[in-house]
Amino acid sequence: MKDNIELTIFTPEKNIKIGEIKEVITEGLDGDLAILPNHVNMITYLKPTITKYIDLNGNKNNIFTSSGVLKVEDNKVYIICDASEKPEDIDIKRAENARKRAEERLRNKKEIDVKRAELALFRSIARIKIKEL
């Protein structure tokens, strides 16, 4: 049995190899997921959220992950998503403006894609929350 898992995040712009860690906590469509060493192999959809991971020194880390897919296979965790950002890389003004635009679109539901506006709102809120941590 292995004591660690390996985390890699793939986006269209970049691959983020976090490396060996103790645990990943993220949010799937049905709620929170905690992935520990020797987790059963699985694939699930993810919501835009703050993904948390604990490194080998026990430090808690956060990274924004947008909607996507999580795959667990043989103590390797792969997150494939549209975007991923570390807290220090998030432009808070841009995230706040995106939240305001999404909220306005949802208030005026005429001729908009509600699901798309909701996802934009979820992404912006997660980005804002991670900056507040």
From Swiss-Prot:
Name of the protein described by the UniProt record: ATP synthase epsilon chain
Signal peptide location: none
Gene name for this UniProt entry: atpC
Record function comment: Produces ATP from ADP in the presence of a proton gradient across the membrane.
Compartments it resides in: Cell membrane
A GO-annotated cellular component: plasma membrane
Keyword Signal annotated: no
Chain segments annotated as coiled-coil in the UniProt record: none
HAMAP family: ATP_synth_epsil_bac
Main location: membrane
SUPFAM superfamilies: Epsilon subunit of F1F0-ATP synthase C-terminal domain, Epsilon subunit of F1F0-ATP synthase N-terminal domain
KW Acetylation (keyword) present: no
UniProt KW keywords: ATP synthesis, Cell membrane, CF(1), Hydrogen ion transport, Ion transport, Membrane, Transport
Subunit structure: F-type ATPases have 2 components, CF(1) - the catalytic core - and CF(0) - the membrane proton channel. CF(1) has five subunits: alpha(3), beta(3), gamma(1), delta(1), epsilon(1). CF(0) has three main subunits: a, b and c.
Pfam families xrefs: ATP-synt_DE (PF00401), ATP-synt_DE_N (PF02823)
GO MF: ATP binding; proton-transporting ATP synthase activity, rotational mechanism
GO biological process, one term: proton motive force-driven ATP synthesis
Membrane topology: Peripheral membrane protein
Family the entry assigns: Belongs to the ATPase epsilon chain family.
